[in-house]
Amino acid sequence: MMLRTEEMILNVGPQHPSTHGVFRLILKIDGEIIQEATPVIGYLHRGTEKIAEGLQYTQIIPYTDRMDYLSAMTNNYVLCHAVETMMGIEVPERAEYLRVLAMELGRIASHLVWWGTYLLDLGATSPFLYAFREREMIINLLNELSGARLTFNYMRIGGVKWDAPDGWIDKVKQFVPYMREKLHGYHELVTGNEIFRQRVTGVGRYTKEEAISYSLSGVNLRSTGVKWDLRKDEPYSIYDRFDFDVPVREGGDCLARYECRMAEIEQSLRIIEQACEQFPPEGPIMGKVPRIIKAPPGETFVRIEAPRGEIGCYIASDGKKEPYRLKFRRPSFYNLQILPKLLKGENLANVIAILGSIDIVLGEVDG
């Protein structure tokens, strides 16, 4: 007697704890095997780029906080960097160091959220609590610097909003060895755990050629063996002053993406350590910026390395106080595109493991 199966449509989301945002995934399944996966996005679309056309350049900065709200500092920076490039504004050295410290602390905080929630999705409760314990220390540091805990609005065109308060650099220095010790504990608890490794090894695999054809960037690209990091390959700000490595793995699976992100935390700690040692004892935090910012007519595009990949900012200016056109290249949007390919033919139980390993933020996907 032949066993007959029946196709079924299964909705994951839009309200689901493992989607980490308002995201819907329509799965066509045959038994436990996925035949087709269709992502449905747009639930968090707010029209940021269109709104920006009616705002002055400085008024756009708070909107960038709300794209990838887990790494708001890098979003702030890419907009300011684009306007500074168009106008030829020179940023003071002290401000550049503050920017780098803020962005790298934000990168670690972002990866900690990913680590904790990813393992929670896989069934491990304790790492989630540990991750948020360490993240809280970073959030407190950034709160002292910017006055906010999540949407910082800290960067300014030409510099930063506030100088570092007294003793802040010393607190950052103390955080580095503390975080290194905790990171070692994470590896003992999870990375070397045989149950975890069997759960993610070989799952959600793609090749470097596929990664490039889908325009993947960041960890999702480097996990296939492509050594590409804009902080090294196209240095911006003062990243060319720091000695750090670009973590690369060859597997292209969930484990490779996990190991790349964990290694990135260590490299961010190296950058922070060097930035604290090199930090100028005094100096201005704002460059020479006109009272009313009017970018000259023309176009520019800049890109930087955010925690989820390359974030870019395109500005077309007609010489007014507002941009004629503003466009962000949002890495989560591009990284999500490979998901249907990864899920086809996979077991239903692997959906959450694969989605979590890509590490998307829906505010960034929808814009």
UniProtKB/Swiss-Prot annotation:
<keyword id="KW-1003">Cell membrane</keyword>
<dbReference type="GO" id="GO:0051287">
    <property type="term" value="F:NAD binding"/>
</dbReference>
<dbReference type="InterPro" id="IPR001135">
    <property type="entry name" value="NADH_Q_OxRdtase_suD"/>
</dbReference>
<keyword id="KW-1278">Translocase</keyword>
<keyword id="KW-0472">Membrane</keyword>
<comment type="function">
    <text>NDH-1 shuttles electrons from NADH, via FMN and iron-sulfur (Fe-S) centers, to quinones in the respiratory chain. The immediate electron acceptor for the enzyme in this species is believed to be a menaquinone. Couples the redox reaction to proton translocation (for every two electrons transferred, four hydrogen ions are translocated across the cytoplasmic membrane), and thus conserves the redox energy in a proton gradient.</text>
</comment>
<dbReference type="InterPro" id="IPR022885">
    <property type="entry name" value="NDH1_su_D/H"/>
</dbReference>
<dbReference type="GO" id="GO:0048038">
    <property type="term" value="F:quinone binding"/>
</dbReference>
<dbReference type="Pfam" id="PF00346">
    <property type="entry name" value="Complex1_49kDa"/>
</dbReference>
<dbReference type="GO" id="GO:0050136">
    <property type="term" value="F:NADH:ubiquinone reductase (non-electrogenic) activity"/>
</dbReference>
<comment type="similarity">
    <text>Belongs to the complex I 49 kDa subunit family.</text>
</comment>
<keyword id="KW-0874">Quinone</keyword>
<dbReference type="InterPro" id="IPR029014">
    <property type="entry name" value="NiFe-Hase_large"/>
</dbReference>
<protein>
    <recommendedName>
        <fullName>NADH-quinone oxidoreductase subunit D</fullName>
        <ecNumber>7.1.1.-</ecNumber>
    </recommendedName>
</protein>
<keyword id="KW-0813">Transport</keyword>
<keyword id="KW-0520">NAD</keyword>
<dbReference type="GO" id="GO:0005886">
    <property type="term" value="C:plasma membrane"/>
</dbReference>
<comment type="subunit">
    <text>NDH-1 is composed of 14 different subunits. Subunits NuoB, C, D, E, F, and G constitute the peripheral sector of the complex.</text>
</comment>
